[in-house]
Amino acid sequence: MKKIYLFSALIIVALSSCNTLKLMVDNDYSYETDFTKYKTYNFLNCEIDTSFVCSEIQDAIRRQMKARGYKVVADGPGLLVSYSIIRDRVDYKGYFQPSLDRWVNHFDGDDTYKTQNFHFGGGMILVSLLDAESSRLIWRGYASGVFNKQVNKPINYYRSVVRNIFDQYPLFAAGEKPRKIEEL
């Protein structure tokens, strides 16, 4: 009898894990940017949001920026952070390029943008970093499939999505060194 309960429990766990879909996470950045000069940031306004997703995402971004040593300032930030919540299918032309840390630390003049078309379903969260002085987009990270109806959304789901996006941004604020999360 115990074997039947154990087998049933294993089947339930296996079926519930099928309910969680993998998110597609990627990023794009500007080759013309000196990422090592930024220390501070502030947010641009989010779209009007009645579901509190916007505030959850902003809080998650704030945590990720703090973990990388960036400071929020009201006046004269180096970076402006923007984020978009897209609930529909997204089709756009993007670029294949070397990883950001490789570009910053090991510039190779032969590295070039290679265009490619992207088609994403299930909605998307898009995080953009802009140079505050020029308003130029310097980095954009995204996760698609975020609003797919089959995705199981546990507590802190959006925090996890934003963390996965920022895993694509391995840089720290000017003068900062990587440190453990406990030090925050």
For the regions a language model picked out, list residue spans one by one.
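C-terminal/domain-edge helix-coil "capping" segments
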Residues: 19-31, 116-124, 131-139, 144-184
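Sec-dependent N-terminal signal peptides
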Residues: 6-10
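A short, structured loop/turn motif at beta-sheet edges
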Residues: 35-38, 72-77, 129-137
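Positively charged n-region of N-terminal signal peptides that target proteins for export
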Residues: 1-4
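C-terminal motif of bacterial Sec signal peptides marking the signal peptidase cleavage site
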Residues: 14-17
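N-terminal segment of the mature soluble domain
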Residues: 40-92
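Surface-exposed short loop/turn segments
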Residues: 83-138, 144
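N-terminal post-signal-peptidase region of extra-cytosolic proteins
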Residues: 27-28, 63-68, 112-113
